């Protein structure tokens, strides 16, 4: 793949533009008025957001999408008139003769058929070499980039903060981005989750600052060179790419060398021993970290702590996010903010307002005394941390507003007073390779749940042949848990939950796949006037 990304005006074409990582990059390019094209197989709120700012999307992945870029303007118009999936009123051919104006440059394009007319093709690890568009890009001689190449190029344009780590990247990067936004620094933000404060997974600012989520899943983390790097933790994950923790550590060590400053959580022994960050943080007051906390109070609706900086008390920290892991994420934001010269009061004011990213302990609603929460946890450590946070809700009066992530302070419960008595975990394992590699750890990750329902593995493109299955996962969990149930399909999960959930339950959906799709339908059933708690034979 090519390494040099031209950000001066040449068109970009994203294969799989609707993905969470790809769409964030496409959004930044489109907002910078660079010609932005892409393909995907279905429309979503993410792709509609891109189209609204001028991105042009093909709803199929075919070689002819790229052939468009070698045609004359007249040929393009004919092609587009026969392609009803594109909005012709928005479409301006990117290879017409003349000048393409961008924010910083005026670039003169040569005659059609010239190599300068070919788009720069961006793909992710999910796109393989058999993809018809990818093959067409190779045959046409298009510059082809991994999405990490494009992110690396963007990072070089800014005073950048790149947040890496096995867990907590999205929350930490979005929290840092929100902090800079509240501080009036108008950052550019590129993350792997959606945040209401900027209406999606990316925003284009006007300042020199960029906050990016840095993904280690495929080894491409080594391409990123940030002014400030953050590492939240390091564990073995993505067994489809890594065979050992040592391989993961090597990637993070290269990342450290590429960053001018490294902020790291030394509660993780691997970060402490293998990376030795220049600026450290810890939620253990006995540690020798530069930033640490004491007087910690984990409550059902808030976390409180006193923050220390290099042996001196900074002051009180209050955050709406629950659990030890989120206190650690907030402390990372404190360390970054102080490194940037922000006043502690500015930092804490922002953290106190932050409501979290979507699908990170996201409150989806309450019906008939049942609270519904959506969470992205799909690794044993993430499940442990998330269920521990869920347990903080038990036996607490949630009145009048349950305090659970996004929109939590604007959604009132239907009941004047609601007490959580039971945590029900609904788990959709993600990838056969991960499930097989960590089956022993998954088996012991649900101790903080009162009931566990397991459904079929979300393959994420992996073959199921000869692989572990979810019934085996349920059996493994049942060795450590008394109430574990297996339901094969999402429909059967929904029907089962309708039978067993009751007032006082917190139903938490744990999935990086599509499990959360059943939440709206399930809530709608509970809102029907004839709803009553049913009993059934549980097996």
Curated annotation (Swiss-Prot):
Localization (cell): Cytoplasm
Enzyme Commission number(s): 6.3.2.8
SUPFAM superfamilies the record matches: MurCD N-terminal domain, MurD-like peptide ligases, catalytic domain, MurD-like peptide ligases, peptide-binding domain
GO biological process: cell division; cell wall organization; peptidoglycan biosynthetic process; regulation of cell shape
GO molecular function, one term: ATP binding
Residues engaged in binding ATP: 165-171
Regions annotated as coiled coil: none
Keyword flag Cell wall biogenesis/degradation: yes
Listed GO CC annotations: cytoplasm
InterPro entries membership: Mur-like_cat_sf (IPR036565), Mur_ligase_C (IPR004101), Mur_ligase_C_dom_sf (IPR036615), Mur_ligase_cen (IPR013221), Mur_ligase_N (IPR000713), MurCDEF_pg_biosynth (IPR050061), UDP-N-AcMur_Ala_ligase_MurC (IPR005758)
Disulfide topology: none
Function: Cell wall formation.
Protein name in the entry: UDP-N-acetylmuramate--L-alanine ligase
């Amino acid at each position: 793949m090519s390494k040099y990304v031209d950000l001066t005006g040449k068109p970009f074409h994203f294969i799989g533009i609707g993905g969470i990582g790809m769409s964030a990059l496409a959004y930044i390019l489109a907002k910078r008025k660079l010609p932005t094209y892409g393909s995907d197989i279905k429309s979503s709120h993410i792709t509609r957001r891109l189209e609204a700012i001028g991105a042009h999307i093909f709803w199929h992945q075919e070689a002819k999408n790229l052939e468009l870029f070698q045609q004359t303007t007249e040929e393009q118009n004919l092609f587009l008139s026969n392609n009803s999936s594109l909005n012709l009123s928005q479409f301006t051919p990117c290879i017409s003769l003349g000048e393409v104006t961008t924010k910083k440059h005026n670039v003169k394009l040569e005659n059609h058929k010239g190599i300068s007319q070919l788009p720069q093709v961006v793909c992710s690890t999910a796109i393989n070499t058999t993809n018809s568009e990818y093959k067409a890009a190779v045959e046409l001689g298009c510059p082809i980039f991994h999405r990490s190449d494009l992110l690396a190029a963007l990072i070089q344009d800014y005073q950048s903060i790149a947040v890496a780590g096995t867990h907590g990247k999205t929350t930490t990067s979005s929290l840092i981005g929100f902090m800079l936004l509240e501080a009036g620094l108008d950052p550019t933000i590129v993350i792997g989750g959606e945040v209401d404060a900027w209406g999606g997974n990316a925003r284009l600012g006007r300042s020199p600052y960029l906050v990016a989520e840095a993904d280690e899943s495929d080894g491409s983390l080594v391409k990123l060179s940030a002014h400030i790097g953050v590492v939240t933790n390091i564990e073995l994950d993505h067994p489809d790419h890594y065979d050992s923790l040592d391989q993961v550590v090597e990637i993070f060590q290269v990342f450290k060398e590429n960053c001018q400053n490294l902020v790291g959580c030394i509660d993780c022994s691997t970060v402490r021993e293998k990376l030795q960050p220049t600026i450290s943080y810890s939620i253990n007051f006995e540690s020798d970290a530069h930033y640490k906390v004491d007087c910690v109070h984990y409550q059902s609706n808030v976390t409180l702590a006193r923050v220390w900086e290099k042996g001196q008390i900074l002051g009180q920290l209050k955050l709406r996010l629950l659990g030890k892991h989120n206190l650690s994420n907030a402390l990372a934001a404190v360390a970054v903010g102080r490194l940037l010269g922000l006043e502690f009061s500015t930092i804490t004011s922002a953290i106190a307002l932050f409501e979290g990213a979507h699908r990170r302990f996201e409150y989806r609603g309450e019906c008939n005394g049942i609270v519904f929460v959506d969470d992205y946890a799909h690794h044993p450590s993430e499940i442990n941390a998330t269920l521990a946070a869920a347990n903080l809700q038990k036996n607490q009066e949630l009145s009048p507003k349950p305090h659970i992530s996004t929109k939590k302070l604007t959604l009132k419960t239907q009941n004047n007073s609601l007490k959580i008595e039971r945590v029900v975990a609904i788990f959709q394992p993600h990838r056969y390779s991960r499930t097989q590699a960590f089956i022993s750890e998954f088996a012991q990750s649900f101790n903080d749940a009162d009931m566990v329902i397991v459904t079929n593995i979300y393959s994420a493109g992996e073959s199921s042949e000869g692989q572990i299955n979810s019934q085996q996962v349920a059996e493994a969990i049942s060795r450590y848990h008394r109430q574990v149930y297996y339901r094969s399909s999402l429909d059967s999960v929904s029907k089962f939950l309708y039978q067993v959930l009751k007032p006082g339950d917190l139903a938490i959906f744990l999935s990086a796949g599509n499990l959360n799709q059943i939440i709206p339908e399930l809530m709608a059933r509970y809102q029907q006037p004839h709803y009553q708690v049913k009993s059934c034979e549980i097996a």
